[in-house]
Amino acid sequence: MLLNDYRPVYVIGIGLHRYQAATETSYVQLGVTAVREALADAGMEWSSVEAAYTGTTRLGMAVSRPMLRHLGATGIPMTQVENASASSSSAFRLACRDVAAGFSDVVLAAGVDKAGKVNRGEQLTGIAPHDGGLVVPSVHYALLAEEYMRASNVGEEVIARVAVKNHLNGSKNPYAHRQRERSLDEVLGDRPIAGSLKRLECCPIGEGASAVLVVSDAAIDRLGLDRSRAVQVLSSTQRSEELYGAKSFDVELTKTTTEQSLAEAGIRAEQLDVVELHDAFAIEELQYTEAMGLCGPGQASRELANGEFAIGGRVAISPSGGLLAMGHPIGPTGVGQIAEITRQLRGEAGPRQQPNSTYGLAHLVGLGAVCVVHVLAAAGR
């Protein structure tokens, strides 16, 4: 099923609870805060929502019911989605398919999570190891960083510049976990986590929530919603790993999924104005930027240094601060990306605004095994 083979699908309301270090705040409060903000942003009542999908990874079973009943017990179908880091990206995809196929006119896609008691190496990524703790993702990406530096003949400062850019963006985002600018010296001088990777080159985990409302044309008209703020979802693509025969299978997975999503949307990579990608580690941004076709092979470090990926550059990458600064509470991360892309395409991102944004892309990888990519377009493009 291609999204554009069916009814047009739009994002009309967005909401977030700030991503933050673990607190005593209940997940219910986190989630309800985000959903209420999305409803207010859309200008609609909870009673208009016809179905809900919630992405989460660490909260147990049937998370949606005790959370959403605080908004009203309306009898709507609720589905919980777990797909590692791509959990709420997958929830959003399911919401889009519901609306596109005509099963519902208004669907909530949300994400919520709270940090659990895991070791520091696991906390850096939000992904629990499957080998008894002998290997954690930070080691994997440290090795990829070493290989990238060797193949590209560059030093550690090249990867550190990703963290500098994204912390600058995060400092302008009131929802971000990390809201402080960092210099190149601060990043390079920070505590090492694995290999050459420093703490500030690894995403923080914590807690938070995100929510978006997905609607049809019929819902916009019936509910009297503001069509000028409706951002269209042009494509929704999800793939799983194949036998790529490559050193970094998640890079190959990103390449194939992005190519498919752009083709379904009917646009080229060079038309993208804003991108939110899976930068759990700084090295990932360089790898995925090249895999997505946003620059040529081996060119990401040079274009980053030239400001091509900064806000105001050729294409703004991770203007929210990305996973490195916005944070990666896992469950909310994917829908949080959709919220940022929507804000950018509406021209409502304030000091983070990428000028004249028409097309945006959101990308997440789940445990290296699944990849979800969405392409969105501004109203009246």
Where are these predicted regions, by residue range?
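Conserved active-site "lid/cap" helical segment
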Residues: 1-86, 148-155, 178-183, 196, ...
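Short acidic, glycine/serine/threonine-rich loops at helix termini
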Residues: 23-24, 118-123, 171-175, 225, ...
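Active-site-proximal alpha-helical scaffold in enzymes
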Residues: 82-112, 138-172, 212-218, 326-349
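Conserved catalytic cysteine-centered active-site region
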Residues: 4-7, 55-110, 114-128, 133-141, ...
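Extended C-terminal subregions enriched in glycine
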Residues: 259-282, 291, 323-326
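Short glycine/threonine-rich loop-to-helix capping motif typified by GTGT followed
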Residues: 58-69, 245-249, 279-302, 329-331, ...
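Condensing-enzyme catalytic core mediating Claisen C-C bond formation in acyl metabolism
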Residues: 1-25, 161, 192-256, 260, ...
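Beta-strand segments within the central parallel beta-sheet cores of soluble alpha/beta enzyme folds
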Residues: 11, 46-55, 77-83, 107-111, ...
